[in-house]
Every structure is written in C-alpha cells, then in structure tokens.
Amino acid sequence: MAEPLLELDHVTAGYHGQAVLRDISLAIAEGSVVTIIGPNGHGKSTLLRTISGLVQPMSGEVRFDGQSLRGRKVHEIVALGVVHIPQGDLIFPDMTVRDNLLMGAYLPDAHAEADTRIVEIFSLLPKLEERQNQIARTLSGGERRMLGIGRGLMTGGQILLVDEPSLGLAPIVIDQIYAVITRLRDEGRTILLVEENVSRVSEIAESIHLLDNGSFVWQGPPEELQLHQEILETYLGG
C-alpha cells in the first residue's frame, strides 16, 4: 500500500499548554478529498493550523510526503507543498486582485512560475480575471473568498487545506465555490476540507471525519453518514 501523502500520528495540540486536539490520527492518500466536520470551537481550524505549522504539536507527529513537519517554520511547510487557505476573507484590501494573487507566489519556485500560474487561476476563476485590476476591498464577499482560494493556489502545492469555504456566503455563491473545489478534485488535487455544510461536502468527499471536543468520534464515507441521522442531530443540529 502506498504511503499517505499526509499523516497525523496521535497528535495532541493546542494553545498555552491547553490541549484542543487530543490524540488525533489521520491518513490522507494523494488525490483524495477528506472532510472534517463538527461543532464550532471543537478544534477543526486548530487541526489545519497544526498541519500548516501555525500551531506546534504537544505530542505526536505530522508527516507530509514521508517527512516530519515537527519544528519546521510555516514557509518551509509551504515550500514542501502544503497550502493553507484559512477561514474568512484574508486578503490585502488596498491592493489589486492581480497583486493579491502575486503575493501568493512569494516562494522562489512559485515566483518563477507566477505568470503561468496566474493564467491557470484565471481559467479556474474567470471572475478574478475580469476583476484583476480592481481594488480587492471593493469585491463582493464571494469574490473575496475566491481571491483567497486563488492566492493559495499561486503557491502551487500538493495538498490544499481549506477552512470553511462556504461560511457566511449566499447559496448561489456557495455553488460557485464548490464548483471550483469540484474541478480541483477532478484535476487530482489532494484536499483536506473543514466544513459545516454536510450536504455539500457529501457530494465531493471520499471520507468524512466528525470532530467533537478535540477528538474524532465518527469517520466513514458520506453515504454512511447520511444513514446516521442521530449523529447529525447530536453534533450538528440535524
């Protein structure tokens, strides 16, 4: 069996000595889409932050492509191929759309391929091409979310860590965002997706992991989760 692209081995992590994640183990194969669901404030974003180096594990190991990430700086983890697209609209508001995208190509390898990558991103996100000379703060909420995704893609990367891409967006915009994620999946991208919109992730994920109070309490394929209405009602309010 091939080694997983990303592996968390009994990871405990948190802030100021207080554990938020407890004994988390997870293996993600290359080219797969895995989703983390669960109540707010129970560790989903912390899990992504631990993988990307923003939070260091208290114990356990995070490995990417066979290499330990322990002690590595964030930019070193990005250079290995881990792209973290955080929750919300973290953009440079007074820069143009194009310049925001170019900020994602700050690593030497990405910078050398910036012109090629920006063409690819405009193909994936044509609205950004239309808005490329527009100041970012004038974009709609959905366009800002797409800009954040596009900037993350500018780094290249083998795996995308995407944190609640549908948060606070209108249904029609969520459709657009998930069309992009679906296309990335179809292109063979490896994606770890944090989301509360169970119906949407059930359409694209190969496996779903339910995180509650810092631990996985259920995991399996989406079609199996739909058979356990009591789980959805208990942890996600239905």
PLM segments and residue spans:
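ABC-type ATPase nucleotide-binding domains, specifically the catalytic core motifs of the NBD
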Residues: 16, 34, 72, 97-116, ...
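Helix-to-loop junction immediately C-terminal to a conserved catalytic motif
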Residues: 52
